[in-house]
Amino acid sequence: MDDDAAPRVEGVPVAVHKHALHDGLRQVAGPGAAAAHLPRWPPPQLAASRREAPPLSQRPHRTQGAGSPPETNEKLTNPQVKEK
């Protein structure tokens, strides 16, 4: 049996118990325990430099798929049109 196993409740999957145990380990107990928190990521200095980064170069977006452009000659695109 694991040393860090949470007490089991019949019919509850093991993963649920492990998740509950993990959440319990992350909680801070009592005043002055703020240093026990896990470090935030990204650190504030790194997060600030990311916000100030220049935007990526804008590439024109293609609105049409690959291949030939559609025909513009009405006679070719609509066979029901007859010459006058």
From Swiss-Prot:
Expressed in testis and kidney, and, at lower levels, in urinary bladder and liver. Expressed by a high proportion of tumors of various histologic origin, including melanomas, sarcomas and colorectal carcinomas. It comes from the Eukaryota. GO terms for biological process: immune response. InterPro entries: KAAG1. It holds the Pfam family KAAG1. Disulfide bonds: none annotated. Transmembrane segments: none annotated. Residues 75-84 have a biased composition (Polar residues). This is Kidney-associated antigen 1. It comes from Homo sapiens. Residues 31-84 are annotated as: Disordered. The gene is KAAG1.
